[in-house]
Every structure is written in C-alpha cells, then in structure tokens.
C-alpha cells in the first residue's frame, strides 16, 4: 500500500477476444479456449528519496564509510550524520524495484496466453489450463545499483526472479471432476489442482475468507492479466453436494501446499529485496551499504575517525545469505475445511448465506531466523581476558596481537560474528479460520459481505526486533572497556582515552525476548518472527454495471469495497511491536541520538540510530478500495480495449 503514495503507472492494454476449438463425438466433448492479451505499464513519477536506502541516495554512497556511523568513544556526531541524512533506514532491503526504473521507463510489457482445455465424457470432466507469459522489457533488464562500494553498477537478474514475472509457463488448473447424485441430490467430486472461491471479498484478499488459493502478486501487476489468473490453483479434493432444497455443503482436503507469490525482488512493484527470489539480506538500519558477497568489514581507525576500532578486532560483514525459499515451507497435509451454503429466499427477496471453517498453513511468509554464533568474548570478564579467549581477535591486528601474546598459529576467533545470523522465510502451520458471508441485491447494486475470525493468526513481529534477538549471542554479554587494552600489549593505537565495545544488551536491547521470557538467547537458537493473535476482519462489497456512461465504453463495472481488521489483545508498544512495513522503520528501543533514553542524552552504545514511535500495526485498522473496469469491444481487428482505474 505504501507505494500508492509515489507510484503513478500508465497502463495500455489490448485484450484479444477468446478463440476456441470445439469437438463433439457421441458423449465426448472437447473444448480448447485460448485468451491472449498484450499490455504495458510506464512509470510516471520520479523517485521519492525518502523511500530508498540512505546509502543509495545519490551523493551519499560514502555516508558511513569512514566510521560506520558508529562511535565507540561516546561521540554522537557519527550517528547524527546518519540520522540527518536523506533516505530510509530500512530501505536497504526493499528499494531495488524503485532503483531499477526511472521516470517514463516501461516497467512491464507483458504478452500473455491463457489456454484452457476441457474434455467431457458423460458425467466426467477433465480440465487442464496453463498460462504462458513473456515480458521483453524485464527479461533483458539488468539490476541497477546506486552504491558500488562492494558490487558493480549493474548485475544480471537470477533465473528464479525472471521466472516469476518475465518469462515462464505455469500449470494452473489440472483436475478430474465427476458429477453424480445420491438420494436424488446432486453432488460433484473433483480431485486435482483447482480453484475454490470462498467468501465475497473481491479487492481485499489478505485475511479474507478466500484463503484456499494463494494470490500471485506478480500476476496482479501484469498489465493484461485477469482476476482468475491472480489466484493460484492448489492440489485438493472437493466434494460439493446438496443437503436439502436451498441447503448445500462443500468438504475439502488440500493435499498440496502452495505459498503466495510475492512480486519478484527488483521488479517495479516489489517492496522486499528478500522475498520473491532475493538471495541476501542486509543487517542494517541505514549505515551499511549493499554487500551481496560479504566483502565489507568494519571500519578501522583513520585520521578522519580515530575511534573506529571494530575493524582492528573483527572481520564480520553486515550481510547474510538467505536460506533457500523452501526451507521454511510447511507440510503438505493437515489442511481441510467445510462450507455450508443456505439460500434464504425469505431475506430481502433472496440472500445467499455461507458458513465456513478452514484449517490451513500460512500462504504468506514471515521473517524468522537462527541466532548468530557466540562471540568468543561473550562470557569474558573483561577486555584483557577477551583478548586471550579470542586468540588475539579476528581483525587487522590479529597477527600482531598473537605475536605479543605468544600464541602464533592458533586460529583467531570472532568477537562479533554478526553475519552468522541465518534468515529464512517461515510459513506457520495450522491456522484456524471461521467465517460467514452474505450476497444479495439492493436496487441496481449487488451487495455482499463477509466476516472472518482467526483465533491463532500469526502476525509479523517488527523485523528489526527479531534481528536484535538473533544478534544477542554475537557480542559480549557486558560492555567491554577497551581503553587500557593497548598499553599492556605494547600497541600504539590512535584512540582517545575512553573506548567501549558495547555488550549485546546495550547494542541490541529488544522486546521479543522479554515478551517470550527468554533470559539468554543461545547461539543458533530458532527465533520465530511471528506471534499469534486473535484477529477478526469484515469486508463489504458493492458492484454495479453501467452500460450508459459519459466515456463511451460498452460497459463500466464499478467495484467498491470497504474492510476493517481488529487485533484482539494486542500488547502495548512497550511490550511488543507488530510490523507495519513503513520506510522509516528503525526500532522501538532507545536510539543512539538520545530518543527513548531516560534522560534524553545520546547513548552511542545503541546500534539503533533513533527510536521509532509510530508506524506499527494497531488494534484496529480500516480502508477503502475501488476499481472501475472499462470495456471497449472490437476496437480494431476484433481486439478489445480494457483500461482500469484503481484507487
């Protein structure tokens, strides 16, 4: 939703009329229907620099290069340089799509073919449907990188990203259906990959009753794609039957899980460089530039920054490889549900009612991780003992330190293994959904609505707090005074009189560990990035067709939808924060600039540059969505023109 503020896309779409081949012989019926479309979209506005990473803003490539915008001598100036700079703190993991397309650039030009084969024989029906698409604009486009300290200015997109939205073929429906009757009641059994639409929500898909078929966001943003192409068919068995006049039931069991498909990382509408084929994540709140190959190391002392001592003792980078996408996938089994449908002829001249239950595994990914390795100084009593425990540390001075200690040849150990945290996309299992819906007519409007309730819906904990929890083992348990470390070793360092290496509690004070009662995070401990809550959601939809209109269209279909979500028993912000995905994300803990500290004074031991106080999920939220579908038939050579206006 946040990109609505800055994206205006011009779209041109020509949808070819469907053409079909039909064949019939006795009880055998064969139909092949093909639908082709061509569409293009163009970016119409410049970038908003507040939405891209601080180190990706033009002129700020070296913003923190000299000192990592961190001070070990309690000097607030490096952090304030970061705070005052243009750009988004957390944008480093979500701005590739913004950087790849300039104003007036085509962001997509998709040709799409949807082929649907149906073979009927008596009471049996076999359906196989597939979609092929090609986008020459994105298939040939390279990734663009503003910051080139640790990578080139251009790079090739990986095959997985290209397959999501640039060139691929996808099997959609593939199922066998059998129509029969029991006690003079009609019944249908279908088995295979298919779509089952529950509920009445049209434009608000997330957390609606229409949960069975996960959406494909890449298809949603393809100019020319149809609504029936957005939701992915899944493998399941479905039994639909009449119980009595006006009363019916659906029973289903899903035997194959599929996730929602996010926009490909780096595509125009993407909001994450991790989900959708991303291969690495930056552990950064604005200070560290993109480093896909883990080439960067902490800053070292210089004339410009004599206090940057981390590089003397550590070789950690500030990026990490993402575990394979399938790592956090749930099991295929254990997903089932039922629907009861009732046609209430006595209500408003005819109203369809539905009652639902579904047990399913999440289609949406959550950011979870395994905690970092233990710092070799995690339990060292002081810096001198840490020097021995770490075999002379693991930085640029290691060889000299080992020689002075008389331990040459021992493998150096890492005091700050920040880049050993392991991030993965997590899909929680066994979410329960209960719901009801209605569908009726009021005047010339088709009006429908639904309510869904989930007693154990996972919600994403603020990602920076999840990361802070995972980084607890990567620093000493207590602050380490490094001031007197150099003299006993005979080393002259360009350092001031006070130097402090912050402990984990000072650098990464978090909320998630306290909320879950974790006294000490262990190395490699699994940190689930979600917390389950009771959540209810209501949607109301109105649809009206206009054949007579001032735009000369053959028809305009107007869809209006309102929705509201309630999170029950959401804890206050001083206990836990739920991610809302704003560009200015930092962390709700105290900032190095003094925000959130008891006395308001800067405390440079904190990695968090400034406290975030807004932009979290709230107990109640609501919104409106609308779409006008305009149709101009047979514009030229049998092609139709179908512009869409989405608000």
Predicted regions mapped to residue ranges:
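Short loop/turn motifs that connect adjacent beta-strands in outer-membrane beta-barrel proteins
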Residues: 20-32, 44-47, 107, 117-126, ...
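Residues on the lipid-exposed face of transmembrane beta-strands in outer-membrane beta-barrel proteins
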Residues: 34, 113-119, 128, 173-178, ...
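Solvent-exposed loop segments that connect transmembrane elements
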Residues: 50-95, 139-162, 210-222, 263, ...
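Detector for outer-membrane/organellar transmembrane beta-barrel domains
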Residues: 106-108, 358, 448, 515-647
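Residues that define the transmembrane beta-barrel architecture of outer-membrane proteins
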Residues: 28, 107-111, 167-172, 231-235, ...
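N-terminal signal peptide c-region/cleavage motif recognized by signal peptidases
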Residues: 15-17
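Outer membrane beta-barrel
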Residues: 120-278, 623-625, 642-644
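Transmembrane beta-strands of outer-membrane beta-barrel pores
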Residues: 38-44, 132-136, 193-197, 253-259, ...
């Amino acid at each position: 939703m946040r990109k609505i503020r800055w994206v205006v896309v011009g779209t041109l779409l020509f949808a070819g009329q469907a053409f079909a081949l039909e064949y019939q012989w006795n009880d055998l019926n064969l139909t092949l229907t093909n639908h082709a479309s061509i569409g293009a979209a163009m970016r119409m506005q410049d970038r908003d620099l507040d939405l891209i990473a601080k180190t990706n803003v033009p002129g700020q490539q070296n913003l923190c290069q000299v000192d990592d915008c961190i001070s070990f001598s309690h000097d607030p100036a490096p952090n304030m340089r970061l705070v005052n700079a243009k750009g988004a703190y957390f944008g480093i993991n979500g701005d590739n799509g913004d950087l790849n397309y300039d104003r007036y650039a085509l962001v997509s030009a998709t040709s799409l073919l949807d082929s649907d084969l149906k073979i009927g024989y008596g009471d049996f029906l076999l359906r196989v449907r597939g979609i092929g698409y090609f986008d020459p604009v994105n298939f040939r486009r390279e990734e663009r990188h503003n910051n080139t300290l640790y990578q080139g200015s251009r790079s090739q997109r990986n095959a997985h990203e290209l397959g999501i939205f640039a060139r691929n073929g996808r099997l959609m429906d593939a199922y066998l259906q059998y129509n029969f009757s029991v006690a003079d009641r009609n019944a249908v059994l279908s088995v295979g990959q298919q779509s089952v639409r529950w509920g009445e929500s049209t434009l608000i898909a997330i957390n609606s009753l229409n949960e069975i078929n996960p959406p494909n966001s890449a298809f949603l943003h393809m100019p020319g794609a149809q609504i029936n192409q957005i939701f992915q068919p899944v493998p399941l068995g479905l039994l639909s039957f009449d119980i009595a006049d006006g009363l019916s039931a659906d029973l289903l069991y899903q035997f194959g899980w599929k996730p929602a498909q996010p926009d490909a990382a780096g595509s125009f509408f993407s909001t994450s460089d991790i989900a959708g084929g991303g291969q690495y994540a930056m552990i950064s709140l604005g200070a560290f530039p993109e480093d896909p190959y883990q080439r960067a190391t902490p800053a070292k002392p210089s004339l410009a920054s004599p206090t940057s001592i981390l590089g003397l003792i550590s070789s950690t980078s500030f990026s990490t490889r993402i575990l394979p996408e399938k790592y956090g996938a749930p099991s295929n089994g254990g997903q089932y549900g039922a629907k009861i449908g009732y046609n209430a002829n006595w209500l408003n001249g005819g109203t369809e009612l539905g009652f639902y239950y579904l047990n399913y595994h999440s289609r949406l990914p959550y950011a979870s991780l395994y905690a970092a390795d233990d710092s070799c100084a995690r339990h060292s009593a002081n810096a001198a003992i840490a020097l021995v425990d770490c075999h002379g540390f693991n930085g640029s001075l290691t060889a000299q330190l080992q020689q002075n200690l008389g331990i040459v040849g021992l493998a150096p150990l890492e005091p700050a293994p920040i880049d050993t945290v392991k991030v993965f996309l997590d899909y929680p299992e066994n979410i329960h959904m209960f719901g009801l819906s209605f569908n009726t007519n009021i005047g010339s409007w088709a009006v429908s609505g639904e309510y869904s309730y989930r007693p154990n819906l996972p919600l994403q904990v603020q990602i920076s707090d999840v990361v802070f929890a995972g980084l607890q083992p990567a620093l000493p348990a207590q602050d380490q005074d490094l001031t007197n470390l150099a003299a006993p070793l005979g080393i002259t360092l360009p350092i001031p009189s006070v130097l402090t290496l912050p402990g984990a509690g000072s650098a990464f004070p978090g909320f998630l560990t306290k909320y879950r009662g974790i006294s000490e995070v262990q190395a490699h401990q699994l940190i689930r990035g979600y917390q389950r809550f009771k959540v209810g959601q209501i949607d109301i939809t109105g649809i009206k067709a206009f054949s007579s209109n001032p735009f000369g269209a053959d028809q305009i279909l107007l869809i209006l939808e309102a929705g509201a979500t309630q999170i029950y028993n959401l804890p206050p912000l001083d206990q836990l924060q739920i991610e809302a995905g704003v560009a200015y994300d930092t962390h709700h803990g105290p900032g190095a600039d003094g925000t959130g500290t008891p006395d308001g004074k800067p405390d440079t031991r904190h990695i968090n540059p400034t406290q975030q106080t807004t932009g979290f999920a709230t107990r109640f939220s609501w919104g409106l969505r609308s779409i006008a579908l305009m149709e101009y038939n047979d514009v030229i050579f049998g092609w139709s023109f179908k512009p869409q206006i989405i608000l």
